Amino acid sequence: MCIRDRYLVTAAATMAQFAAIEALSAGKDDAQPMKVEYLKRRDYILEKMTELGFKIIKPDGAFYIFAKIPEGYNQDSFKFCQDFAREKAIAIIPGVAFGKYGEGYVRLSYAASMDTIETAMTRLKEFMEEHAEA
């Protein structure tokens, strides 16, 4: 092998290869408890936001909810999220951050503790009640 090839041919370290074998053979079910927990969090948010009038397609493989802001509220997703953050100290992401077709939507993560999610949903309900257009 010439000197040049020594720097072009690489592989994972032997230790890392053995660790990968162990993880793939013995750790197949290690993620199952977290999967159950994430589904619980997702379903809780879906229920609470649907009650508030958000339209949501249930995600099957992500840690995020992408929800349509209900009619009768400011449809400017950036302003909606900015006002919510300022008034309720909870961050959600405006849909427009994901492109022009995301306008009118918001994105929330459910990769947070259940306590944090419950607080966020309580504050979102308060915010929606305070900002409903008559």
Question: Where do the PLM segments sit?
Answer:
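PLP-dependent class I/II
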Residues: 4-134
